[in-house]
Amino acid sequence: MPELPEVETVRRTLTGLVKGKTIKSVEIRWPNIIKRPAEPEEFARKLAGETIQSIGRRGKFLLFHLDHYVMVSHLRMEGKYGLHQAEEPDDKHVHVIFTMTDGTQLRYRDVRKFGTMHLFKPGEEAGELPLSQLGPEPDAEEFTSAYLKDRLAKTNRAVKTALLDQKTVVGLGNIYVDEALFRAGVHPETKANQLSDKTIKTLHAEIKNTLQEAIDAGGSTVRSYINSQGEIGMFQLQHFVYGKKDEPCKNCGTMISKIVVGGRGTHFCAKCQTKK
């Protein structure tokens, strides 16, 4: 699943492609993607004539700011947006097509069909699902080490599981939790409420550092991720542990281990990240 750095990279590349374009019509081939309004036909009707003013992001969600609406889009596992000429062939995995007045098409392609789209009036989206229960952005002023300490102190879940909870902080998934925990020297099974103040400060800093470095590198391509211009990310070349099972740790040479924490495959170095 694309995490914050990948979604932010998609937002940036997509903005350059479609900002200022006006939607002429919407073709919905897989209605289950449309979650609000209940009728896909209404979704298509409301978007006709709307101009894309800007594209924002909230956690792993893209926010298309239009004239009179905000479209909230979650890519889930395999969702991708690409801009095409109308005459270019598509395939069976293209499920929503936004045809623009200039003849180009913004196509939403999703092999797994897990993506979602919600349509709101401006300002409504923050107070409604799926956005209403999200925690702060990692670069928000409110995401301080004191905030993180308070959140983690309230749960005895493994720290890996606590950080994956989007109510704690948004945008973190398997890749960047594993990488941040390694950089902070924290074993993923450590109980969240057992971390010291010093460790939480380090972890807080490494969450922010890891995500920013990943954004700068265009995200991580470990399976099929590409941005809206068809380019892969490069941060996978900087991974310390994720996807490195049975490879030597870059810090100490110990073979990277993979275990299951909270039902999620988890990579770590048993020497650099001792369990306490």
From Swiss-Prot:
Name the InterPro entries on file.
DNA_glyclase/AP_lyase_DNA-bd (IPR015886), DNA_glyclase_Znf_dom_DNA_BS (IPR015887), Formamido-pyr_DNA_Glyclase (IPR020629), FPG_cat (IPR012319), MutM-like_N-ter (IPR035937), Ribosomal_uS13-like_H2TH (IPR010979), Znf_DNA_glyclase/AP_lyase (IPR000214), Znf_FPG/IleRS (IPR010663)
Q: Which UniProt keywords apply?
A: DNA damage, DNA repair, DNA-binding, Glycosidase, Hydrolase, Lyase, Metal-binding, Multifunctional enzyme, Zinc, Zinc-finger
Which reaction equations make up its catalytic activity?
A: Hydrolysis of DNA containing ring-opened 7-methylguanine residues, releasing 2,6-diamino-4-hydroxy-5-(N-methyl)formamidopyrimidine; 2'-deoxyribonucleotide-(2'-deoxyribose 5'-phosphate)-2'-deoxyribonucleotide-DNA = a 3'-end 2'-deoxyribonucleotide-(2,3-dehydro-2,3-deoxyribose 5'-phosphate)-DNA + a 5'-end 5'-phospho-2'-deoxyribonucleoside-DNA + H(+)
Which residues are noted in the entry as DNA-binding? H93, R112
Cofactor: how and how many bound: Binds 1 zinc ion per subunit.
Q: Which residues form the active site?
A: P2, E3, K60, R264
Q: Which Pfam families match?
A: Fapy_DNA_glyco, H2TH, zf-FPG_IleRS
| Enzyme Commission identifier(s) | 3.2.2.23, 4.2.99.18
The record ties this protein, via CDD domains, to: EcFpg-like_N
Q: What happens when the gene is disrupted?
A: Cells lacking this gene have a 5-fold increased spontaneous mutation frequency. A double mutM/mutY mutant has a 1000-fold increased spontaneous mutation frequency. Triple ytkD/mutM/mutY disrupted strains show increased mutation rates during both exponential and stationary phase.
First and last residues of each zinc finger (FPG-type): 240-274
User: Which Gene Ontology molecular function entries are recorded, alphabetically?
Assistant: 8-oxo-7,8-dihydroguanine DNA N-glycosylase activity; class I DNA-(apurinic or apyrimidinic site) endonuclease activity; damaged DNA binding; DNA-(apurinic or apyrimidinic site) endonuclease activity; zinc ion binding
Output the GO biological process annotations, alphabetical, semicolon-separated: base-excision repair
Cofactors needed by this protein, per the record, are: Zn(2+)
Protein family: Belongs to the FPG family.
- HAMAP family recorded for this chain? Fapy_DNA_glycosyl (MF_00103)
Instruction: Please describe what this protein does.
Output: Involved in the GO system responsible for removing an oxidatively damaged form of guanine (7,8-dihydro-8-oxoguanine, 8-oxo-dGTP) from DNA and the nucleotide pool. 8-oxo-dGTP is inserted opposite dA and dC residues of template DNA with almost equal efficiency thus leading to A.T to G.C transversions. Involved in base excision repair of DNA damaged by oxidation or by mutagenic agents. Acts as a DNA glycosylase that recognizes and removes damaged bases. Has a preference for oxidized purines, such as 8-oxo-dGTP. Has AP (apurinic/apyrimidinic) lyase activity and introduces nicks in the DNA strand.
Q: How does it assemble?
A: Monomer.
Designated name of the protein: Formamidopyrimidine-DNA glycosylase
